[in-house]
């Protein structure tokens, strides 16, 4: 190839060599990038861990503390007031000749959608465990999300300085509750002064951090022959044995080596990297972020064991030299307007570039920024594999795929292939929202529109019956944060109505009816006659009755008309007849339809919707209420009082398990309607000694008494 290039002349040869060197540089640059997310249960120490990473990487000059409200990644007023992460935030920092793009994600169940979108942008994750609690409810949730995205993982067992921390139990939880294969690279030990130190399994050394310089430096000392060294050598041998069963290259060396002691450390680390990126094992490290122990070695492990961008996302190779980028978050900046966070999957994004969303909308990138939470450094171009903030994108929404390709036929394919539309969980609560005055209505609608671009789990709808704007959200905290953000960011003091439970409805029995409607609109005759049936079915929402007597009629309907009938019919399922809940477990079956010439699609759609509403009233519906799964940890002497209170709340006790020496954990399912203010009640019953986590776990039928009570609540009579 080089010979051919020279034959075509020196100018072409120089261009070819420049292109080759440019490709090599880009590949080398990409290999040094690590895009990672930090996942955990609430209060496990994600944000503190992130703040330490920024400090030791030289990005910040002082340690950010959650309890002081001076963290970089928790920059929203609501986050600093409450001491929790609400929105995912992106930060970029250098570490040992690598560039780490890190996303700090929320731990609260109300903000699970934030985590889901962030995982589209990363190549690996660090899961932080609370060393005193092990695997908790939200840990299981975020782990399953990482499973869905097939992401390699590291475990960081935090808070190991605490006297009640239990490293062995945490590792056991990983095996039992997450069904994964952990490999321990470190073990905790106490120094002579009682401070937490770490024994390194691979290098057979002890790591001790210096608190005088806030943990910036640490000593690594080779262990002298002792019981500690013998135990650590056994752990190293177990690690080699475990990895050799998963990695052929290491297995060949082990077979030809006299002793495990002679297996080279670098060989072990390469085998561990291969096993981790292939998701065969999960390396486990430990430390204490608050006490400044173990963070540098965690960052080393991110560089060593988690994959580079080029090792994943090969599916996007089909874009060739075109740009492909995934929008994983949108934030609103007072000075710069909407800012779009994009993970660049292929190509290079430059300032002023024209991009097309997979929805077919053209956008122009006015400016590019490198992310550091709510601070930004302007750049001119960003390479494949990196994360960038784009300014000037006006119609792009979270979850969009951006590309420089303008081929129309590629839009539909990318929608199918790359799952553009995010899977938004059902709302758990809803409430009305009112502006402080009529003049503020437009400003409120604009604020809600912007918040929806940022947060797809926020539902905004208009109730034609009451004439109110209705919000749907993932929980009480979610709704409270939305109100607070509208006030602090948009200066609108909105009023939220009382929170209502998001009940669902299901039909009691099948029903069949025919609806014929004729009307003259603007001199044009509109006529529709339609026969529909509703039946119990959890599979398809809409189907055709292809029986011999109906098939000839259905064959005369054009595909566009069938689509209009389908859309109108399904829209009626959004509001059931009893409490306005979504109708589920129901299928609409079209038997036949006759559409008059010149009848507008909107008239056909409205008739189909009216027909379904008539059917729902005829068949009757039953209510389904949301059920929550709770994990309650409390001292053993408080358990009886807590369980007595739960029984009054229609709760189902699934299990009571020991949790340490003094505590027990109650696993329980309870209706959401019975849990209003439960966290306060639990504090009272347990005298502040109990803790609780809660997450949705489906819907359940109700008896007639509870249904009547739910209807009265929905009507504002309770």
From Swiss-Prot:
Transit peptide residues are: 1-29
Any single biological process term in GO:
mitochondrial translation
What intrachain disulfides are recorded? none
Write down the Pfam families for this protein, in alphabetical order: EF-G_D2 (PF22042), EFG_C (PF00679), EFG_III (PF14492), GTP_EFTU (PF00009)
Residue stretches making up the tr-type G domain: 31-310
Where is the protein found, in the record's own terms? Mitochondrion
Query: What highest taxon heads this organism's lineage?
Result: Eukaryota
Keywords from UniProt, A to Z, are:
GTP-binding, Mitochondrion, Nucleotide-binding, Protein biosynthesis, Transit peptide
Q: Which residues bind GTP?
A: 40-47, 104-108, 158-161
SMART domains in alphabetical order: EFG_C (SM00838)
Citing just one GO molecular function, the answer is: GTP binding
Q: In which broad location class does this protein mainly occur, judging by the first location in its UniProt entry?
A: mitochondrion
Q: Which residues form the signal peptide?
A: none
Q: What's in the GO CC field? A: mitochondrion
The record's annotation in Gene3D superfamilies points to: 3.30.230.10, 3.30.70.240, Elongation Factor G (Translational Gtpase), domain 3 (3.30.70.870), P-loop containing nucleotide triphosphate hydrolases (3.40.50.300), Translation factors (2.40.30.10)
Q: What InterPro entries does the record point to? A: EF-G-like_DII (IPR053905), EFG2 (IPR030851), EFG_II (IPR041095), EFG_III (IPR009022), EFG_III/V (IPR035647), EFG_V (IPR035649), EFG_V-like (IPR000640), G_TR_CS (IPR031157)
What does the UniProt function comment say about this protein? Answer: Mitochondrial GTPase that mediates the disassembly of ribosomes from messenger RNA at the termination of mitochondrial protein biosynthesis. Not involved in the GTP-dependent ribosomal translocation step during translation elongation.
Query: Which HAMAP family does the annotation name?
Result: mEF_G_2
What family is it from? Belongs to the TRAFAC class translation factor GTPase superfamily. Classic translation factor GTPase family. EF-G/EF-2 subfamily.
Q: Indicate what this protein is called per its UniProt record.
A: Ribosome-releasing factor 2, mitochondrial
Species source reads Drosophila erecta (Fruit fly)
> In the UniProt record, what gene is named as encoding this protein?
mRRF2
């Amino acid at each position: 190839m080089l010979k051919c290039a020279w034959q075509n002349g020196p100018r072409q040869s120089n261009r070819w060599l420049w292109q080759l060197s440019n490709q090599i540089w880009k590949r080398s640059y990409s290999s040094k990038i690590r895009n990672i997310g930090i996942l955990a249960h609430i209060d496990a120490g994600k944000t503190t861990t992130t703040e330490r990473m920024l400090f030791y990487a030289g990005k910040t000059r002082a340690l950010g503390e959650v309890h002081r409200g001076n963290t970089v990644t928790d920059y929203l007023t609501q986050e600093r007031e409450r001491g929790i992460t609400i929105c995912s935030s992106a930060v970029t920092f250098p570490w040992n000749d690598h560039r780490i793009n890190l996303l700090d994600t929320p731990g609260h169940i109300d903000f699970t959608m934030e985590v889901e979108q962030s995982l589209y942008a990363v190549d690996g994750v660090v899961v932080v465990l609370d060393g005193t609690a092990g695997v908790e409810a939200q840990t299981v949730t975020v782990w399953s999300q990482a499973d869905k995205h097939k992401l390699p993982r590291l475990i960081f067992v935090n808070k190991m300085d605490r006297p009640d921390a239990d490293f062995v139990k945490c590792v056991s939880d990983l095996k039992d509750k997450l069904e994964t294969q952990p490999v321990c690279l470190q073990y905790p030990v106490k120094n002579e002064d009682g401070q937490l130190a770490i024994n390194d399994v691979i290098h057979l050394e002890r790591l001790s951090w210096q608190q005088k310089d806030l943990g910036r430096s640490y000593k690594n000392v080779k262990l002298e022959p002792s019981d500690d060294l013998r135990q650590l050598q056994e752990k190293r041998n177990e690690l080699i044995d475990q990895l050799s069963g998963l990695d052929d290259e290491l297995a060949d060396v082990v077979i030809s080596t006299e002793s495990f002691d002679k297996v080279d450390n670098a060989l072990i680390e390469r085998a561990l990297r291969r096993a981790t990126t292939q998701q065969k094992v999960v390396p486990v490290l430990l430390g204490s972020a608050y006490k400044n122990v173990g963070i540098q070695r965690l960052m080393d492990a991110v560089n060593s064991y988690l994959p580079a961008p080029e090792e994943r996302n090969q599916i996007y190779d089909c874009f060739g030299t075109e740009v492909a980028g995934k929008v994983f978050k949108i934030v609103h900046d007072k000075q710069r307007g909407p800012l779009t966070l994009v993970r660049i999957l292929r190509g290079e994004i430059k300032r002023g570039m024209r991009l097309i969303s997979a929805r077919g909308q053209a956008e122009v990138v006015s400016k590019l920024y490198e992310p550091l939470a709510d601070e930004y450094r302007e750049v001119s171009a960003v390479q494949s594999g990196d994360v960038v903030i784009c300014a000037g994108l006006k119609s792009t929404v979270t979850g969009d795929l951006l590309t420089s390709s303008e081929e129309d036929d590629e839009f539909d394919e990318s929608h199918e292939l790359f799952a553009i539309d995010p899977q938004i969980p059902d709302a758990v609560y809803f409430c009305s929202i009112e502006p402080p005055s009529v003049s503020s209505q437009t400003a409120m609608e604009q604020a809600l529109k912007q918040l929806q671009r940022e947060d797809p789990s926020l539902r905004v709808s208009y109730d034609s019956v009451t004439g109110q704007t209705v919000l749907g959200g993932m929980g009480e905290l979610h709704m409270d944060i939305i109100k607070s953000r509208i006030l602090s960011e948009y200066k609108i003091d909105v009023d939220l109505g009382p929170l209502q439970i998001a009940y669902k409805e299901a039909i009691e029995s099948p029903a069949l009816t025919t609806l014929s409607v004729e009307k003259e609109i603007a001199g044009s005759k509109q006529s529709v006659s339609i026969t529909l049936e509703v039946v119990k079915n959890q599979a398809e929402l809409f189907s055709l009755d292809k029986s011999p007597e109906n098939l000839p009629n259905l064959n005369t309907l054009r595909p566009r008309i069938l689509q209009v009938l389908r859309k109108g019919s399904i829209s009626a399922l959004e509001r059931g007849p009893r409490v306005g809940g979504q109708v589920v477990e129901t299928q609409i079956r079209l038997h036949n339809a006759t559409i008059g010439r010149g009848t507008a699609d909107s008239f056909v759609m409205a008739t189909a919707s009216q027909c379904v509403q008539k059917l729902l009233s005829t068949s009757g519906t039953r209510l389904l209420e949301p059920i929550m799964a709770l994990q309650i940890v409390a001292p053993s002497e408080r358990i009886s009082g807590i369980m007595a209170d739960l029984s009054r709340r229609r709760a189902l006790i699934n299990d009571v398990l020991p949790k340490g020496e003094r505590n027990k954990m109650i696993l329980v399912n309870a209706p959401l309607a019975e849990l209003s203010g439960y966290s306060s009640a639990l504090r009272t019953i347990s005298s502040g000694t109990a803790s609780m986590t809660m997450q949705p776990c489906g819907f359940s039928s109700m008896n007639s008494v509870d249904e009547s009570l739910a209807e009265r609540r929905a009507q504002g009579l309770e």
